[in-house]
């Protein structure tokens, strides 16, 4: 059965992708999931520089589930391109990179860095609710969102 789907001009073998933030950059789950069998791996957010994220504790159990406030901890674009992209490609995965930033120029820097990398799509993260500066404001401010989108599309 052919399960191929096309999204933004890119064809994926099936519509099953990981959710950003829940799957790291794939290596954390490859003992449980064949990365090549997925339509794509959507990575955890990647910024222009490494982010430490929020201090612990970052997860709290509640009656209805769990809350998390990881704070977009990530290795930064340079290490991501050196380590994570080659690993995902070696495993046969299609790659959707979740791009995060604290300013329009941060987003543009990451997008420019990824321009020559073998990634399939970019997902622009402007709505992560656990970042004190940056992300939440962009998603709630139409003018800021427009500026980020315009700057990225210009690249």
Task: Annotate each language-model stretch with its function.
Residues 1-155:
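Flavin-dependent oxidoreductase catalytic cores
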């Amino acid at each position: 059965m052919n399960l191929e789907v096309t999204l933004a001009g890119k064809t994926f073998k099936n519509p099953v992708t990981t959710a950003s933030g829940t799957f790291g950059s794939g290596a954390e789950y490859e003992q449980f999931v064949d990365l090549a069998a997925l339509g794509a791996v959507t990575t955890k957010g990647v910024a222009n520089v490494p982010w430490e994220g929020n201090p612990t504790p970052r997860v709290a159990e509640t009656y209805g589930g769990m809350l998390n406030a990881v704070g977009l901890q990530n290795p930064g674009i340079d290490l991501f391109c050196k380590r994570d992209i080659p690993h995902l490609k070696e495993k046969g995965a299609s790659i959707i990179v979740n791009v995060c930033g604290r300013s329009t120029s941060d987003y543009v820097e990451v997008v420019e860095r990824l321009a020559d990398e073998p990634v399939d799509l970019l997902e622009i993260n402007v709505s992560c609710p656990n970042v004190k500066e940056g992300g939440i404001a962009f998603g709630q401010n139409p003018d800021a969102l427009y500026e980020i989108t315009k700057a990225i599309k210009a690249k």
